[in-house]
């Protein structure tokens, strides 16, 4: 009996040592990164990447499924898009140009292998932890108007802050659309959920939620403006 107990003890010690060695080797050889890359949910890095576009862009088409979105004003006359890349690369942004229209999306085909419920749970925790890095920041050109802006953003929160949007169509399925300190003209925004608008100038535009929560504070109205909620519909003319 003592020999059997001693054998199990030796086996346990050896297994523990081998486990630590494998962890060290895996970390040194990017094994952890490779494991994270197998997650079916996006796991984002804390480093930032940026792409920039100039006057060659006259129209913008942005579609996001795996990122939250913040729209603001650029410091120059260029379009700047910043984001945190995903470990797998499957959820990174891809861009394309056609007829002076810039298309940006994070919708990519992804393959996922079954790794076992334990590892899947750990990867899900890692994904949730990295969600604070899921934001895409779109900085629109300062002093230059685009002919058309089309945005579809379907994750978490969409924020428009200190920005000027004209000829814009925005559809979002996130839980919140927040607009603050901005100028919106000839545009249409639609969401099924919460809309909060603060210190914003609205001109000939429609803001619509299919839900019941549409909150506005300190806004200026010019031309025909529609603020529409499930329980409230206001058509306002200056």
What is the predicted role of each segment?
Residues 228, 232, 236-237:
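Cationic, amphipathic, low-complexity alpha-helical segments enriched
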Residues 219-221, 230:
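Histidine- and/or cysteine-centered catalytic micro-motif in compact active-site loops
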Residues 2-59, 68-155, 159-172, 178-191, ...:
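Acidic (Asp/Glu) and glycine-rich low-complexity loops/linkers
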């Amino acid at each position: 009996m003592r020999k059997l107990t001693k054998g199990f003890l030796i086996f346990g010690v050896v297994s523990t040592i081998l486990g630590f060695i494998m962890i060290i080797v895996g970390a040194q050889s990017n094994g952890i990164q490779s494991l994270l890359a197998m997650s079916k949910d996006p796991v984002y890095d804390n480093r930032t990447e940026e792409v920039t576009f100039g006057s060659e862009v006259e129209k913008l088409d942005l579609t996001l499924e795996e990122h939250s979105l913040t729209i603001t004003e650029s410091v120059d006359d260029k379009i700047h898009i910043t984001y945190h890349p995903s470990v797998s690369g499957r959820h990174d942004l891809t861009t394309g140009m056609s007829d002076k229209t810039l298309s940006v999306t994070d919708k990519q085909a992804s393959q996922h292998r079954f790794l076992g419920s334990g590892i899947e749970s750990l990867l899900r925790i890692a994904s949730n932890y990295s969600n604070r890095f899921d934001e895409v920041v779109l900085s629109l050109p300062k002093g230059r108007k685009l002919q058309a802006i089309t945005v579809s953003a379907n994750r978490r929160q969409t924020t428009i802050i200190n920005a000027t949007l004209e000829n814009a169509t925005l559809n979002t399925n996130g839980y919140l659309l927040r607009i603050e300190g901005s100028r919106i003209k000839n545009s249409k925004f639609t969401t099924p959920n919460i809309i909060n608008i603060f210190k914003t100038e609205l001109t000939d535009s429609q803001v619509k939620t299919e839900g019941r929560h549409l909150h506005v504070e300190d806004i200026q109205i010019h031309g025909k403006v529609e603020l529409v909620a499930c329980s409230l519909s206001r058509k306002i003319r200056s």
